């Protein structure tokens, strides 16, 4: 039996946690700092803050007790990127060294470094990245969703992919941790600019021109910082770029539309 803990009870943690709980994985816990969210999940089967209209699986539990980390087989980090590194260092005493840590957050870590770079050499745990075009609302509503799993050691890919077998979550795989991280960060910048273009010009020609230039620039930046060009063709690359830049559910695109 796998014991899975999601650090964070926000939209993405709740959505992916509910996927596993609905599958029948016995021990799925959201570790939260929000007492009201914990109470609403455990007592009402709803996350009233993030998904007030979605009934959650009875297998999904929530707690504020960090001791649940000690026995976890897999820990998903579902908190903002700027908090991931600090959280892991501050709570190192609770971490099982054999737990697989899977980072869901998209963005820079402490001191504007990539999160894997901040963690490297400080934890014995296997550390994986899980990035892709993934609106939490669609995940929890059972829409098929693709993620790229990135890790330096291939043996852990099967453990995570088997966990999600027969669910609406699909995977591709990469050893290019730097490229996967950069792709998940850079697309946010271009999404804002594409939103600005669409708000001010609403030109299909101009949008297509800028998308082409953006993809080429992302590719160059990834290569220059040690990533691999092939990562642009994973879910974390063009897939996440397209979702974030061209869909009005995207917060970054929406910001651009409002500027």
Identify the meaning behind each predicted range.
Residues 56-58, 64-144, 160:
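Rossmann-like NAD(P)(H) cofactor-binding subdomain of soluble oxidoreductases
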Residues 248-259:
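Divalent-cation-assisted or electrostatically stabilized phosphate/pyrophosphate-binding catalytic cores
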């Amino acid at each position: 039996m796998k014991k899975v803990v999601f650090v964070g009870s926000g939209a993405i943690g709740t959505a992916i946690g509910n996927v596993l709980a609905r599958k029948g994985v016995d021990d799925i816990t959201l570790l939260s700092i929000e007492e009201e969210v914990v109470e609403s999940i455990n007592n009402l089967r709803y996350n009233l803050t993030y998904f007030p209209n979605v009934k959650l699986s009875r297998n999904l539990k929530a707690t504020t007790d960090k001791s649940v980390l000690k026995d976890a087989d897999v820990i998903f980090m579902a908190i903002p990127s700027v908090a991931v590194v600090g959280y892991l260092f501050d709570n190192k005493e609770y971490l099982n060294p054999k737990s697989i840590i899977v980072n869901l957050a998209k963005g820079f870590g402490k001191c504007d470094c990539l999160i894997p770079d901040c963690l490297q050499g400080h934890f014995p745990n296997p550390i994986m990245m899980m990035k892709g075009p993934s609106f939490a609302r669609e995940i929890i509503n059972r829409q098929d969703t693709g993620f790229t799993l990135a890790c330096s050691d291939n043996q852990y890919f099967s453990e995570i992919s088997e966990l999600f077998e027969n669910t609406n979550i699909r995977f591709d795989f990469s050893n290019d941790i730097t490229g996967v991280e950069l792709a998940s960060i850079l697309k946010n910048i271009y999404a804002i600019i594409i939103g600005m273009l669409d708000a001010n010009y609403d030109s299909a020609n101009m949008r297509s021109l800028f998308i082409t230039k953006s993809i080429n620039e992302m590719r160059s930046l990834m290569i220059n910082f040690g990533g691999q060009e092939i990562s642009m063709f994973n879910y974390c690359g063009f897939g996440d770029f397209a979702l974030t830049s061209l869909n009005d559910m995207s917060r970054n695109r929406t910001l651009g539309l409002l500027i």
